UniProtKB/Swiss-Prot annotation:
This is Autophagy-related protein 16. GO terms for biological process: autophagy; protein transport. Pfam families: ATG16. Its main location: membrane. The gene is ATG16. It is a peripheral membrane protein. Belongs to the ATG16 family. Stabilizes the ATG5-ATG12 conjugate which is necessary for autophagy. The ATG5-ATG12/ATG16 complex is required for efficient promotion of ATG8-conjugation to phosphatidylethanolamine and ATG8 localization to the pre-autophagosomal structure (PAS). Also recruits ATG3 to the PAS. Involved in endoplasmic reticulum-specific autophagic process and is essential for the survival of cells subjected to severe ER stress. Residues 27-185 form a coiled coil.
Length: 188
C-alpha cells in the first residue's frame, strides 16, 4: 500500500512546511514590531539631535530590513512550496479515488466470476453425474446386446442343425422313394 505511505508522507511534509511558515510569520511579526519600535526611537532621537544614536539606529534598521526581506523571501518560498504540496495532495486524492473505484469494480467482478464459477462447477458436476449414469446404462446395454447376440447365434446354430437334420431326413426319404419307384417300375 505505497500510495498510503506517499499520502502520509505528503501530509507530514505539508505539516512541516506549515510549521516552518509559522516560524517565518512569527519572525516577520517580531521584526515588524522591532522596526516600529526602532522608528519610534529614531523619532525620539531625531528630536534629541543625537547623531550617534541615529546612525546606530539606522544601521540596526537596515539590518532588520535585510532580515525582514529574507523572511519575506522565505515566506514566499514556503508559500509556493505549500501550494505545490496542496496540488500534489489533490492529485494523490484523485488517484486514490480512481484506485478505490477501480478496486471496487474489480472486487464486484471477482464476486461475479466466483458466482459464475460456482454455477459452472455445479453444472459440470451434474454433467459428470449424467455421463457416469449414461456410461453405466451403456455398459448394461452392451452386456445385454452381447448376451442377445450369443443367444441369437445359439438359436441360429440349433436351427441350422435342425434344418440340416430335416434336409437329411427328406433326402433319405426321397432316396427311398426313388428306389421304391424304380423297383416298382417294370423293366423293359
Amino acid at each position: 500500500m505505497s500510495w498510503k505511505n506517499d499520502l502520509l508522507a505528503k501530509l507530514a511534509q505539508r505539516d512541516k512546511s506549515m510549521e516552518t511558515q509559522k516560524d517565518v510569520f512569527l519572525s516577520f511579526q517580531f521584526l515588524s514590531t522591532r522596526i516600529a519600535s526602532l522608528e519610534r526611537q529614531l523619532d525620539t532621537v531625531q528630536r534629541d539631535d543625537s547623531k550617534k544614536t541615529v546612525l546606530d539606529l539606522l544601521g540596526e534598521i537596515d539590518q532588520l530590513k535585510q532580515k525582514l526581506d529574507l523572511a519575506e523571501d522565505s515566506l514566499k518560498h514556503e508559500t509556493a512550496k505549500n501550494k505545490e504540496l496542496v496540488k500534489e495532495l489533490s492529485t494523490v486524492k484523485n488517484n486514490l479515488n480512481i484506485l478505490t473505484d477501480g478496486y471496487k469494480k474489480l472486487q464486484e467482478r471477482h464476486l461475479r466470476l466466483q458466482e459464475e464459477s460456482k454455477i459452472k462447477f455445479q453444472n459440470l458436476e451434474s454433467l459428470n453425474d449424467d455421463i457416469l449414469s449414461l456410461n453405466i446404462e451403456n455398459n448394461l446395454l452392451n452386456d445385454r446386446m452381447a448376451k442377445l447376440k450369443q443367444e441369437n447365434e445359439s438359436l441360429i446354430e440349433r436351427w441350422m442343425k435342425r434344418v440340416k437334420q430335416e434336409a437329411e431326413v427328406l433326402n433319405d426319404a426321397n432316396e427311398a422313394l426313388s428306389r421304391s419307384e424304380k423297383s416298382l417300375k417294370p423293366e423293359g
